């Protein structure tokens, strides 16, 4: 069952900043009217801030829940002077020199004395600026960056693997995956698009002002960003990671051949782990799922670039023995420059006739599922941005022989149970057979990333009145199919600057 938050929990981050329930401070007499204190939540946390606000009010101090023109003293904990100034810039308060910016030690000293203490140098953060590392974004990076020029489409942005905002995008991807498990496509895409935007930024986000004017920054997204800036982590993402349903779905979908529907079915049956599924002999598993469980340990481990290169050599050599003019291209994350992945995708094409099942006779495939082509010539591209293509495909598990390695650190109890040391690894491989004239479109689609492909198709539809999929590009106004012999030609048809594969990690 989906977890329901109790109504007392404030759902929006802005209201959490809002910081305090007025009725808690009712009845306290204000003894020191000349001082108006604001306690920064950044790096302190909401619980501690609430406690300190209540304690100070009980001592007769006037403490504001929100930063306003009446505030005279700003108190911070574990923040340097430059960090406080950075934070103030994002609050649009104008001239910050009117504030006394003080360390938390000043407020605790005041409460111990029961009255305001003198503003000695030791309490002023400006005197302690060197004590803490500053998180300030270099001005040169921000000043040269114009948020309004950031496109809502990732196909108009360049996104390398150098992600300056991983702490935010990791949280977004956890949220998106949870919504995907719940089949809530709208919220899932909201977080994926936001993650895509932040991945393209050339600098780390350290304040809310940094995201002003950026596309795809809705309220839910901004709440998560603000909490991470202030607390260092997202409580919502942590809640998801600890959620029983999410953990089960995450584990179930790691099995080859298991999707959200099957995970939902197993979860409703009371199953929670892969081990529980394997132990339930009443379950009827598909051929693909049986293979997924049989080679589970290998398939859930990462595939290295070296392993991908080794598999690529096997596939190319095998294909070329019966199809000398074939073009075999590794696609997916490895084409975009990634060093690790979970499977390997290959695109295979040839100008001439072809035989598609030769790999099956080489003893290299532990499992394969061939999907025949369903493409109809002159078929209009699909309207759906996530539509499957119609190529002939082979979803396979390949046996990759590996040199023996020193397993001295390996769990000996497990090692002793093995009749012999395994000298191969099962690796997921997708082989996609495409007609030569559709190769450029297939290469663009199968290279990814998934979000880059989505945005490319959205851009074609909404900005160019065209329809794009992995087979073709159709101009609705001219009512013609646009031929392309390369990815560069497709970008040119769409009126886009060419984006290199390693710049498509949206």
Swiss-Prot record:
First-level EC class: transferase
Cross-referenced CDD domains: BRCT_DNTT, NT_POLXc
Residues the entry annotates as binding a 2'-deoxyribonucleoside 5'-triphosphate: 333-338, 342-345, 445-446
GO process terms (BP): DNA metabolic process; DNA modification; double-strand break repair via nonhomologous end joining
Residue span, BRCT domain: 27-124
Positions bound to Mg(2+): 343, 345, 430
Reaction(s) this enzyme catalyzes, per UniProt: DNA(n) + a 2'-deoxyribonucleoside 5'-triphosphate = DNA(n+1) + diphosphate
GO CC term (a single one): nucleus
Keywords for this protein: Magnesium, Metal-binding, Nucleotidyltransferase, Nucleus, Terminal addition, Transferase
Localization of this protein: Nucleus
Function: Template-independent DNA polymerase which catalyzes the random addition of deoxynucleoside 5'-triphosphate to the 3'-end of a DNA initiator. One of the in vivo functions of this enzyme is the addition of nucleotides at the junction (N region) of rearranged Ig heavy chain and T-cell receptor gene segments during the maturation of B- and T-cells.
Protein name per Swiss-Prot or TrEMBL: DNA nucleotidylexotransferase
Organism: Gallus gallus
Source organism phylogeny: Eukaryota, Metazoa, Chordata, Craniata, Vertebrata
């Amino acid at each position: 069952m989906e977890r329901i938050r109790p109504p007392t929990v404030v759902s929006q981050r802005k209201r959490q900043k809002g910081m305090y329930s007025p009725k808690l401070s009712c009845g306290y007499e204000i003894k020191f009217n000349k001082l108006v204190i604001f306690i920064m939540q950044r790096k302190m946390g909401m619980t501690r801030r609430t406690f300190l606000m209540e304690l100070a009010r009980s001592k007769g101090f006037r403490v504001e829940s929100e930063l306003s023109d009446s505030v005279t003293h700003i108190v911070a904990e574990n923040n340097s002077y430059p960090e406080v100034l950075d934070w103030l810039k994002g609050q649009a308060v104008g001239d910050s020199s009117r504030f006394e910016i003080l360390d938390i030690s000043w407020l605790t000293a005041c409460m111990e004395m029961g009255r305001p203490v003198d503003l000695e140098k030791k309490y002023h953060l400006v005197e302690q600026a060197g004590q803490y590392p500053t998180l300030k974004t270099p001005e040169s990076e921000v000043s040269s960056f114009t948020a309004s020029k950031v496109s809502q489409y990732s196909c108009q942005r360049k996104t390398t693997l150098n992600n300056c905002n991983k702490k935010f995008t990791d949280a977004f991807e956890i949220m998106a995956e949870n919504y995907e498990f719940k089949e809530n496509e709208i919220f899932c895409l909201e977080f994926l698009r936001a993650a895509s935007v932040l991945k393209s930024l050339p600098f780390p986000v350290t304040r809310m002002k940094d995201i002003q004017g950026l596309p795809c920054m809705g309220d839910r997204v901004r709440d998560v960003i603000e909490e991470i800036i202030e607390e260092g982590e997202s409580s919502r993402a942590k809640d998801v990671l600890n959620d029983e349903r999410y953990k089960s779905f995450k584990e179930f979908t790691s099995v080859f051949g298991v999707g959200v529907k099957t995970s939902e079915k197993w979860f409703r049956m009371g199953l929670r782990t892969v081990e529980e599924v394997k132990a339930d002999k009443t379950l009827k598993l598909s051929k693909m799922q049986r293979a997924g469980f049989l080679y589970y340990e290998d398939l859930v481990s990462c595939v290295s670039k070296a392993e991908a290169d080794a598999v690529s050599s096997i596939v190319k050599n095998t294909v070329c023995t019966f199809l000398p003019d074939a073009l075999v291209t590794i696609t997916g994350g490895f084409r975009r420059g990634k060093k690790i992945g979970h499977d390997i995708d290959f695109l295979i094409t040839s100008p001439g006739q072809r035989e598609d099942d030769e790999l099956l006779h080489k003893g290299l495939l532990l499992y394969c599922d061939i999907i025949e082509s369903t493409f109809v010539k002159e078929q209009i591209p699909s309207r759906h941005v996530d539509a499957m293509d119609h190529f002939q495909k082979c979803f396979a598990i390949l046996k990759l022989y590996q040199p023996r390695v020193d397993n001295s650190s390996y769990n000996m109890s497990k090692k002793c149970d093995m009749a012999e040391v395994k000298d191969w690894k099962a690796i997921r491989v997708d082989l996609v057979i495409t007609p030569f004239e559709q190769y450029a479109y297939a290469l663009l689609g199968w290279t990814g990333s998934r979000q880059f492909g989505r945005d490319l198709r959205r851009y074609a539809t909404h900005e160019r009145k065209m329809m794009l999929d992995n087979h073709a590009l159709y101009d609705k106004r001219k009512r013609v199919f646009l031929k392309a012999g390369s990815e560069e030609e497709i970008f040119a048809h769409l009126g886009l600057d060419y984006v290199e594969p390693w710049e498509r990690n949206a």
